[in-house]
Amino acid sequence: MVVIGEKFPEVEVITTHGKLKLPEHYIEAGKWFVLFSHPGDFTPVCTTEFVAFQKRYDQFRSLNTELIGLSIDQVFSHIKWVEWIKEKLDVDIEFPIIADDRGELAVKLGMISPYKGNNTVRAVFVVDATGTIRAIIYYPQEVGRNMDEVVRLVKALQTADKGYATPANWPENDFLNEKVIVPPANNMDARKNRLEACKSGELEGYDWWFCYTDLKE
């Protein structure tokens, strides 16, 4: 089972867009990707999730991030389901869906729980442009995902790459609003510099270990 900080396993997958090599396909394009699993095609909760992901697809792309789905259904089932969504709900699913019909990748990624049958749970993997797994979330089969939180997670991880941390409920934190946290000082000189930066107005803060600032683009 993989963990945060590990490289995404190298695999070749069959998708609704043809064969893809992961994570190579996205690394070569210099893109992040969000891989998410769903329990099964032609199921109500999964259908609502796919529509919700598609409606935010442009938002993910603006973050240099692609989407790719996965279940243990066959590719023919994926194709018919995507056609059904277009016909009945008038939504074009533009991102690929992996047909992991033997469950090999799902098992490797810890998407199948022995307590939840043979179908995948609702997993989310955020992978950066180097192929490193940056975040993993698991939802039970009976609970649909919050897509705004997945978008927020990608934004927060990309903000972390700029050297900042993000507070609870960012960018709507009760105290800091959209401001971001400067990592705590780790020695006495840095502590002194932080206090001086807060005093001069270069940073804001409650103490030397709790400093924050506006996010600089």
Swiss-Prot record:
SUPFAM superfamilies in the record: Thioredoxin-like (SSF52833)
Q: Any one Gene Ontology biological process term? A: hydrogen peroxide catabolic process
Give the record's family classification.
Answer: Belongs to the peroxiredoxin family. Prx6 subfamily.
GO MF terms here are: thioredoxin peroxidase activity
Q: Which residues are in the Thioredoxin domain?
A: 2-159
Tell me the residue numbers annotated for binding substrate.
R122
Species the sequence originates in? Methanococcus maripaludis (strain C5 / ATCC BAA-1333)
Locations listed in the record? Cytoplasm
* Enzyme Commission identifier(s): 1.11.1.24
One Gene Ontology cellular component annotation? cytosol
Predominant location category = cytoplasm
Catalytic activity annotation: a hydroperoxide + [thioredoxin]-dithiol = an alcohol + [thioredoxin]-disulfide + H2O
Query: This chain belongs to which protein, by name?
Result: Peroxiredoxin
Coiled coil feature spans: none
Q: Name one Pfam family in it.
A: 1-cysPrx_C
- Locate the active site: C46 (cysteine sulfenic acid (-soh) intermediate)
List the HAMAP family hit by this protein, alphabetically. Answer: Peroxiredoxin
Q: What is this protein's function per UniProt? A: Thiol-specific peroxidase that catalyzes the reduction of hydrogen peroxide and organic hydroperoxides to water and alcohols, respectively. Plays a role in cell protection against oxidative stress by detoxifying peroxides.
Concerning InterPro entries, the annotation shows: AhpC/TSA, Peroxiredoxin, Peroxiredoxin_AhpC-typ, Peroxiredoxin_C, Peroxiredoxin_TDXH, PRX_1cys, Thioredoxin-like_sf, Thioredoxin_domain
